[in-house]
Structures are given as C-alpha cells and as structure tokens.
C-alpha cells in the first residue's frame, strides 16, 4: 500500500489542478493519505491565505475524486507521537529546524529540507498508524 502525506498545500497550487489529479490517479489503488488539519496561516496576508486554502481545497477534492481515503491529523497529534512539542515557544525557524532534525534521524538517506520535513513526519506517523 502507498502512504501519501501532505502537511501543507503549498506545492499543490503551483501546479494545474489537472496535474494534481493525474498524479493522485497513479496512487489511487491501496493508498491512504494522512493530511494535516490546518486552519489559517497566522501572519500571512489575505491573498497568501487564499492561495493556500485554494491549494488545500484542490488537494482535498483530488483525493475525493480519486477515492483515496484521507485521515486528517492535527499537528499536535502527529508531533506528540514523535515526542515533539514546542513548549519552549521556539521561533518558526527554530521549530522547523527541530522538525527537520527529527526527520533526518528517521530518514537518514533522504534529502530532508525545511519544506519536506513536516510531510515526511506525517507520512511516518501514518505508516505507524496503518500498522496498528
């Protein structure tokens, strides 16, 4: 089975919706998507929030159209599963670096970036949950 994970829709809106649908169609058999439950993006402009929401909506509809089961998970839940909690009130960059470090520990042979660490951790969370 295939696990798909997305912690943000930021990459989705950079593509055409048809491209996303074509991509998801490849993985529609025996797949499940773990998708981070998101609210607004604090500190972002209205237009940036709109674009983010549009991409998130396209992703959600693509998953529905392809019949890929989707599990939404809050950041607190998947982060807690790895013993990660931002109790020190780290800056956004410091927190992203913490997530990246954890993803690098779990995936030593992958090229982990600040942009991909959330998705890798959510995917790993999903893999663990699917085994239960």
Stretch-by-stretch model annotation:
Residues 1-9, 13:
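Single conserved hydrophobic/aromatic residue that forms the stacking wall/gate
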Residues 41-48, 107-112:
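A short glycine/serine-rich beta->alpha loop
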Residues 29-42, 46, 70-74:
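Short glycine-rich phosphate-binding loop at a beta-alpha junction
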Residues 99-102, 106-132:
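Acidic, Mg2+-coordinating catalytic module of metal-dependent nucleases/exonucleases
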Residues 71-102:
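Short alpha-helix plus adjacent loop in nuclease-associated cores
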């Amino acid at each position: 089975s295939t696990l798909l994970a997305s912690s943000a829709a930021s990459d989705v809106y950079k593509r055409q919706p048809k491209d996303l649908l074509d991509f998801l169609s490849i993985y529609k058999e025996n797949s499940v998507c773990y998708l981070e439950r998101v609210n607004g993006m604090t500190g972002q402009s209205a237009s940036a929030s709109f674009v983010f929401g549009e991409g998130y909506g396209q992703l959600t509809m693509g998953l529905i159209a392809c019949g890929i089961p989707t599990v939404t998970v809050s950041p607190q839940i998947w982060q807690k599963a790895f013993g990660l909690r931002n109790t020190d009130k780290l800056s956004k960059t410091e927190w992203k670096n913490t997530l990246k470090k954890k993803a690098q520990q779990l995936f030593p042979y992958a090229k982990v970036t600040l942009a991909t660490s959330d998705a890798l951790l959510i995917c790993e969370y999903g893999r663990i949950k699917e085994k239960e």
